[in-house]
């Protein structure tokens, strides 16, 4: 296993390098620049040139990229162009916990809801319960996150007043864990919706295949209780493909967090990325791209490790 992890880590290096190159090229090709957006049009030519020289914007693009790459390898993501020279690492570390919390809670919600409903749907195939779960899953797959989030805000927050419209905590109040949870419920649920629906369908499909296997019929013939047959003998084998699919869904969690954080004004990396993209804050955009790519690579590696833990027959 250790050799496999090392091999996968080494294989990830050229992938991450390619992502940074592609992101840098696209970013530079986009219209506009931070100087135009943030500087006073009446500023003197000398001050304008000083600004350009300070951030190296007059260097050839490949020189800018190599300088950034060299600093990034040393753990230095540079300073924000728009935010008065604030180190990018400080901006990220201030918002990273909020994004990780949102993704963690969304993941737990998706697993806690999708797996039991998938098992229930497979236990009673083509019943009213199965049709209801299937119908709900298809709706969850079809509804865009941004639209669903806005509907929930309008109904549950604006009209009924059950939840706050956004933010991570109530302004001008001391830290309160229940207040944080209250603010977290809606964005976490919206982020989990699409993946919840997909995982429910995958769990149902895999459980149906497993429940038709000979060893399941043997377990039932021995008189084991149905719940033991379903969860001890059936679910463990049905979860193998689900773990793989869940690893592939990690990019959707990261991409979805960008939309959800913007809608709910959640102060996380997704909102920071969108704000920086509009402001053409190049150092922040590049740092966010690297972090997102690393999270995807690490997430898929964890999925592979869990796959081996669940199924001892698999060796790396």
From Swiss-Prot:
- What one GO molecular function would you report for this record? transmembrane transporter activity
Q: Which UniProt keywords apply?
A: Cell membrane, Competence, Membrane, Peptide transport, Protein transport, Sporulation, Transmembrane, Transmembrane helix, Transport
For this protein, the record's Gene3D superfamilies field holds: MetI-like (1.10.3720.10)
- Quote the Pfam families the UniProt record gives: BPD_transp_1, BPD_transp_1_N
Q: Which domain of life is it from?
A: Bacteria
* An example Gene Ontology CC term for this record: plasma membrane
TM spans (from-to): 10-30, 100-120, 138-158, 177-197, 240-260, 290-310
Task: Tell me if ATP-binding is a UniProt keyword of this record.
Answer: no
Q: Where in the cell is it found?
A: Cell membrane
Q: Which CDD domains match?
A: TM_PBP2
- Stretch forming the signal peptide: none
Q: Name one GO biological process term.
A: establishment of competence for transformation
Membrane-topology descriptor:
Multi-pass membrane protein
Domain ABC transmembrane type-1 stretches: 96-303
PANTHER family given in the database record: DIPEPTIDE TRANSPORT SYSTEM PERMEASE PROTEIN DPPB-RELATED
Family statement drawn from the similarity comment of this UniProt entry: Belongs to the binding-protein-dependent transport system permease family. OppBC subfamily.
The protein's job, in short, is: This protein is a component of an oligopeptide permease, a binding protein-dependent transport system. This APP system can completely substitute for the OPP system in both sporulation and genetic competence, though, unlike OPP, is incapable of transporting tripeptides. Probably responsible for the translocation of the substrate across the membrane.
Protein name per its UniProtKB record: Oligopeptide transport system permease protein AppB
